């Protein structure tokens, strides 16, 4: 495909070469992955800048490069084109290279601070049960098709970079997926990764403080989320109980709403929460439906409402959707539970922000018959302002808090625990510090008796622990199972 065709309609300046040349190998934003007759996209990153690797890409065989600034030394024989933002151009070029795969499927894009993975899993489960075609998923658990992992590398944990994203979408299209559910992170929106996904429906779950180390302010964080509803989707499903809903409705007045407190197109009333799940009456279109989901907590009801609305927009009948949700399997790392031989209940959850931790603990405390023991930490090289508040939340709802490591990265784990401890000081909870996460979980389990609930929070279904430059295998639920099987 000609470089000029990949960029047609997008302004650019030719610094060297002929943009009519053919790119036949592929696209990459990594010089290490570039090959013969590839297009290399120079993207500035946190640790490295692609502009510094043009010669490496050229040596690997790349015939063209997109840049956002003029390098001092242009490689011989390489067509170099300057654009205002290489991320924006990369999204366009990647979509065209792979034949705009998003247009061939019903893409449901789910964004929000909390609930993305759960809502996506619910939609996947419902559509899988109600249709014969395999369902594609792109998100925190990695891409999958028909419930099986897709053997394609992803560049970021939640929403891949544009070339990887379009490659995965093309794989799902070629695998005959008709519906794709994808989690969309705020950074993906801010960096234009999803600009040419062509989402049929976008779902907004909620907004609360998180990722401020990336965005700087809540205003910038919110604006990143709002990008999805400013021309990147055809329809919207919005949480009416979140203050941001009003702004989304200004952008998309025809958006459908769901909620519990505010009037909404899909509203839950008479909510009953038990350890086994949540029951409610769904009010929609002048009719009342009995509903039940095997997920405890109000957050489970909100996630179910979002899934119902999205699946209804895909053309499925509400009664069929509700029946499918009743049979929802446990979502790995999302309020995933197991009972120990001692009679305690262990809950593994991804709660890693102030809002999500408080919701998880409020749910646990709501049906606890004995003690609540919380095991958690905070990520290193990430927003440090949430550490003390999360400590205060844990202390307010727990009888015992076991502080531990959660991807400390380059930071001193003890320094992170010091910051969390500041928030614990004003609470009545006992607390202990065990930086080794496995030992911390073991300690909590050893002290958990009949009726106690142990919440292991922060990592969810993650399969690694980041310590310094090392990526070590670690999975909370696997560790819990190993320790309780002794």
What residue spans do the PLM features occupy?
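Acidic, Mg2+-coordinating active-site environments of NTP-dependent enzymes
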Residues: 9, 71-77, 174-175, 182, ...
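Short secondary-structure boundary segments
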Residues: 67-70, 184, 206, 240, ...
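ATP-dependent carboxylate-amine ligase
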Residues: 1-15, 34-39, 49, 128, ...
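Short loop/edge segments at beta-strand edges and connector loops
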Residues: 16-18, 67-69, 84, 139, ...
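Residue-level signal for inorganic ion chemistry
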Residues: 6, 38, 57, 93, ...
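Short, active-site-adjacent cap segments at secondary-structure transitions
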Residues: 72-74, 143-145, 188-190, 243-247, ...
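N-terminal leader/targeting and accessory segments in enzymes
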Residues: 1-92, 96, 243, 267, ...
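Phosphate-binding loop of NTP-binding sites
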Residues: 89-240, 246-253, 368
């Amino acid at each position: 495909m000609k470089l000029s065709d990949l960029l047609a309609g997008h302004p650019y300046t030719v610094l060297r070469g002929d943009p009519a040349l053919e790119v036949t190998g592929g696209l990459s934003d990594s010089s290490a992955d570039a090959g013969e007759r590839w297009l290399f996209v120079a993207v500035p990153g946190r640790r490295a800048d692609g502009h510094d690797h043009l010669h490496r890409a050229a040596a690997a065989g790349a015939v063209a490069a997109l840049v956002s600034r003029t390098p001092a030394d242009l490689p011989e024989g390489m067509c170099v084109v300057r654009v205002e933002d290489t991320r924006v151009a990369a999204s366009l070029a990647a979509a065209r290279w792979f034949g705009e795969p998003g247009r061939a499927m019903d893409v449901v894009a789910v964004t929000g601070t909390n609930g993305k993975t759960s809502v996506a899993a619910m939609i996947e489960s419902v559509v899988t049960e109600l249709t014969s075609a395999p369902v594609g998923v792109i998100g925190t658990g990695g891409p999958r098709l028909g419930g099986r992992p897709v053997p394609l590398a992803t560049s970021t944990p939640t929403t891949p970079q544009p070339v990887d994203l379009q490659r995965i979408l093309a794989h799902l299209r070629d695998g005959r997926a008709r519906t794709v559910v994808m989690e969309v992170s705020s950074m993906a929106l801010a960096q234009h990764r999803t600009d040419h996904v062509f989402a049929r429906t976008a779902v907004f779950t909620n907004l609360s403080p998180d990722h401020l180390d990336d965005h700087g302010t809540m205003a910038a964080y919110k604006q990143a989320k709002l990008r999805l509803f400013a021309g990147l989707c055809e329809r919207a499903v919005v949480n009416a109980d979140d203050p941001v809903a009003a702004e989304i409705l200004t952008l998309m007045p025809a958006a459908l709403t769901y909620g519990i407190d505010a009037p909404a197109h899909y509203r839950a009333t008479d909510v009953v929460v038990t350890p086994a799940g949540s029951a409610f009456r769904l009010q929609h279109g002048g009719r009342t439906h009995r509903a039940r989901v095997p997920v405890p907590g109000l957050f489970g009801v909100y996630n179910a409402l979002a899934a119902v609305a999205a699946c209804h927009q895909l053309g499925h009948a509400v009664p069929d959707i509700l029946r499918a949700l009743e049979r929802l399997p446990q979502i790995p790392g999302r309020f995933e539970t197991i009972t120990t031989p001692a009679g305690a209940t262990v809950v593994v959850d991804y709660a890693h922000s102030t809002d999500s931790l408080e919701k998880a603990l409020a749910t646990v405390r709501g049906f606890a018959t004995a003690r609540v023991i919380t095991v958690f930490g905070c990520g290193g090289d990430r927003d440090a302002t949430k550490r003390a508040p999360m400590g205060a939340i844990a202390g307010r709802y727990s009888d015992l808090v076991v502080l531990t490591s959660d991807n400390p990265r380059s930071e001193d784990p003890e320094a992170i625990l010091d910051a969390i401890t500041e928030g614990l000081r004003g609470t009545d909870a006992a607390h202990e510090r065990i930086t080794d996460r496995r030992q911390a979980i073991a300690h909590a389990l050893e002290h958990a008796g009949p009726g106690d609930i142990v919440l292991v929070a922060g990592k969810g279904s993650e399969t690694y622990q980041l310590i310094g430059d090392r990526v070590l295998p670690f999975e909370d639920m696997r560790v819990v199972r190993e320790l309780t099987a002794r």
